[in-house]
């Protein structure tokens, strides 16, 4: 039985996605749940699935994809370039299947930035960019508020570097980051630190090393050891592109 958990807001993109899931996902005669993000009653619904040991999938915007418009209402701008992630039993893809280069080549031909190009040739970075996940994700995954996570991260970073720490939160209408481009903050950036933010992709695609949680989507190609923030041990190009191909 395919169960798509509906969001009441009629503009939510899930209403477009669920019709495709309900039509095309094989029904194996047991409850299989689908949740769009963490809105509505989804957090409680996911907890119930875990308690009942019922299969569930978390659906949200894709990792390597053309971006959607979010405000004032979400819109898919280009269906051919837009992908969504469907993660089994997790908010993020932690285990992937290595694909042939064909998929990445297809994305690149569509004009999507999908290729790891290497690391900076020199150490010209000046600041650390701190990019927390949303308050909801931070609380669910780290068990503390976003503000608490930011303060903990700042204290830890300051133990090992005296570089400026620059905060960048998710751009939302009315906040200071609304209408800005993360690429501007990545200029002269030494490293990006996050818990689960997809800003890790932006950094890696722009030659910047990343420190992130082990169970984040980019955990396999990022570091946890803040002690090494001045002298990162960066992964090699084939390994990072292989990870991109899994997503």
Language-model segments: which ranges?
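N-terminal pre-catalytic "stem/leader" segment of glycosyltransferase-like enzymes
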Residues: 1-44, 136-137
């Amino acid at each position: 039985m395919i169960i798509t958990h509906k969001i009441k807001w009629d503009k939510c993109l899930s209403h477009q996605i669920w019709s495709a899931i309900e039509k095309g996902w094989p029904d194996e005669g047991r409850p299989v749940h689908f949740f769009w993000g963490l809105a509505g009653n989804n957090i409680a619904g996911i907890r119930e699935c875990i308690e009942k040991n019922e299969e569930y999938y978390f659906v949200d915007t894709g990792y390597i994809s053309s971006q959607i418009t979010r405000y004032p209402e979400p819109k898919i701008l280009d269906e051919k370039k837009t992908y969504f992630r469907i993660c089994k039993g997790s908010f993020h893809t932690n285990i992937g299947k290595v694909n042939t280069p064909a998929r990445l080549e297809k994305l690149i031909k569509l004009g999507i930035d999908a290729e790891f190009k290497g690391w900076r040739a020199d150490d010209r970075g000046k600041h650390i960019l701190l990019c927390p996940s949303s308050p909801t994700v931070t609380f669910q995954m780290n068990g503390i508020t976003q503000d608490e996570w930011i303060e903990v991260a700042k204290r830890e970073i300051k133990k090992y570097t005296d570089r400026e720490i620059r905060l960048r939160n998710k751009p939302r209408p009315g906040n200071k980051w609304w209408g800005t481009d993360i690429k501007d903050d990545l200029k002269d950036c030494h490293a990006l630190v996050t818990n689960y933010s997809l800003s890790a992709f932006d950094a890696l695609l722009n030659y910047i090393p990343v420190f992130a949680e082990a169970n984040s989507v980019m955990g396999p190609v990022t570091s946890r050891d803040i002690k090494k923030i001045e002298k990162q041990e960066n992964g090699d190009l084939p390994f990072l592109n292989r990870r991109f191909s899994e997503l």
